[in-house]
Amino acid sequence: MKILITGTAGFIGSHLAKKLIKQGHYVIGVDSINDYYSVSLKEDRLKSIGKENFTFNKVKLENYDDLSKVFVDEQPEVVVNLAAQAGVRYSIENPRTYIDSNIVGFMNILECSRHFNIQNLIYASSSSVYGANTSKPFSTSDNIDHPLSLYAATKKSNELMAHTYSHLYNLPTTGLRFFTVYGPWGRPDMALFKFTKAIVNDQAIDVYNHGNMMRDFTYVDDIVEAISRLVKKPASPNKEWSGADPDPGSSYAPYKVYNIGNNSPVRLMEFVEAIENKLGKEARKNYMDLQPGDVPETYANVDDLFRDIDFKPETTIQDGVNKFVDWYLEYYKK
């Protein structure tokens, strides 16, 4: 199968490309390789994918003409849209970047998918869409009308836009609400990377909300395993869906949203301890208030994921952290 992945030079995208190629698929990579963080890290991720059954296109999603040319030239059957401007905190200071990448860019993905008869569009949403919701665990049937950051608002917008195209054009769309993904080749702006780097270099780490936080950390291999199964399972209409009692996570149209999380929140200080255990070194800690746009806890209900693709992420936090630290020390030769 020919599968187009946007964000192929990114953290999840590079892992997914390797997974799908190993399964025998042909992967068409798309990425702008912007400088939001280390360009060399992105280029090294691309190198790690190799060249067999893989082609790469340096394209910005905001440029419809360039993007549509990739669809014309490569004729993909499935699209996995992982390209986005990431980061809750960054969105507060750089809002326009999020509109360009996450709204305009996704609109172009939808248009290309519609015009080039894509059989299955899978796209990254985010656990941040749950915003002010405090019911736990977070369920795709929950209301998500109160986002706490522009990043979260753009991700909810993506889900609404996808539903519109599923309704109007019968385009199968599947949105994936990722919960705090971590692992080798991770982004430098994410907690695991920042904490590991700081501890290795004898620098203090910033611990938000004075350590009173919980995250449903999800190992990257579990994320890509779920996506690889969903590649073969396009969204289909929910025959039991009712407009009188609408389920936000499905539809009468070929539209579905899943949580992909570990279904097992970990306390932030336990996460820090896992890094300390692996490095054999205690962190110096700066305890700070909760940051704007952040939430104190995330917790994924993954019942429908297990029901539909017989998969539930299960990598333990210590195992996942160990694999990241091993990669970090090797990559930076510490």
Swiss-Prot record:
Q: Which residues form the active site?
A: 151
Q: Which family does it belong to?
A: Belongs to the NAD(P)-dependent epimerase/dehydratase family.
Q: What does this protein do?
A: Required for the biosynthesis of type 1 capsular polysaccharide.
Annotated source species? Staphylococcus aureus
Question: From which residue to which does any coiled coil extend?
Answer: none
- Pathway this chain belongs to: Capsule biogenesis; capsule polysaccharide biosynthesis
Q: Report the Pfam families cross-referenced here.
A: Epimerase (PF01370)
Its Gene Ontology biological processes? capsule polysaccharide biosynthetic process
Entries under InterPro entries matching the protein: Epimerase_deHydtase (IPR001509), NAD(P)-bd_dom_sf (IPR036291)
Protein name per UniProt: Protein CapI
Q: Which PANTHER family match?
A: EPIMERASE-RELATED
SUPFAM superfamilies reported in the protein's UniProt record: NAD(P)-binding Rossmann-fold domains
EC number(s)? 4.-.-.-
Q: Which UniProt keywords apply?
A: Capsule biogenesis/degradation, Exopolysaccharide synthesis, Lyase, NAD
Q: Broadest EC class? A: lyase
- Keyword Aminoacyl-tRNA synthetase: yes or no? no
